[in-house]
């Protein structure tokens, strides 16, 4: 295990550490990842097959989601935990590697029941464990832990501070926690409220602007939009935590100029793959049949 990683979280009670790649491509690091020579090991792991396919290969029935940081203009990179699918690849696809990947145990049932290609729950970070030194007992009992001596990894419980000192600090700690909790809750509530108001206002303005464009002078040819069944036939994508979209799409809706949020649903144009909030693009397509970004229309 070598190289530089970002430490996202450390759980001392479970003795787990969550790490990620500074360049935001943890999958690439996993292909050469090895915990030998380090105190860390995999907790729960699952076997994945990594593969690459030319971009012209279309596999719609598999709902295949590519790994953006390893894909390029000619080929796309994928991963699957389904061994059956990995054996039924088109001839133009190639298996790059198969290996066990550390996965948070909360994804166990999702991966086991999966019928298609994986959404790669470990795309952002990897969860590792360590067993030595073992301080689980200390952490579980909220005690202090230390080494018995400098030449050993054995641990021992350390003496607690005098009761008098703890009794003086306890009221202060409780007061600070209450004040901090109330302040944080108020700030979070204000930010959420303002954010929702801002997003809703932008979307309303975008919808009004789209409607106003239909008010053409007499004698001017008015471009008709699409019917609802055609609009619904355009692909919809539910965003994950990373909010990544295929192609040149960013994390901002080009219509309302609001950032996408995780779990939001976007709709993509079939010819150019430009994506937008479902509410925004649906309003637009009722009036126009072309993409708001590149003006390509469905032939």
Curated annotation (Swiss-Prot):
Catalysed reactions, semicolon-separated: S-ubiquitinyl-[E2 ubiquitin-conjugating enzyme]-L-cysteine + [acceptor protein]-L-lysine = [E2 ubiquitin-conjugating enzyme]-L-cysteine + N(6)-ubiquitinyl-[acceptor protein]-L-lysine
Membrane topology: Single-pass membrane protein
InterPro entries recorded: ATL20-22-like, Znf_RING, Znf_RING/FYVE/PHD
Entry's transmembrane regions: 172-192
Zinc finger (RING-type): 253-295
GO biological process: protein ubiquitination
UniProt GO MF annotations: transferase activity; zinc ion binding
EC number: 2.3.2.27
GO cellular component terms listed in the entry, alphabetical order: membrane
Xref: SUPFAM superfamilies: RING/U-box
Entry superkingdom: Eukaryota
Location of this chain's protein in the cell: Membrane
Primary location: membrane
Keywords noted in UniProt: Membrane, Metal-binding, Transferase, Transmembrane, Transmembrane helix, Ubl conjugation pathway, Zinc, Zinc-finger
First-level EC class: transferase
Family: Belongs to the RING-type zinc finger family. ATL subfamily.
Domain notes: The RING-type zinc finger domain mediates binding to an E2 ubiquitin-conjugating enzyme.
The name this protein goes by in its record: RING-H2 finger protein ATL20
Natural source organism: Arabidopsis thaliana
Record gene name: ATL20
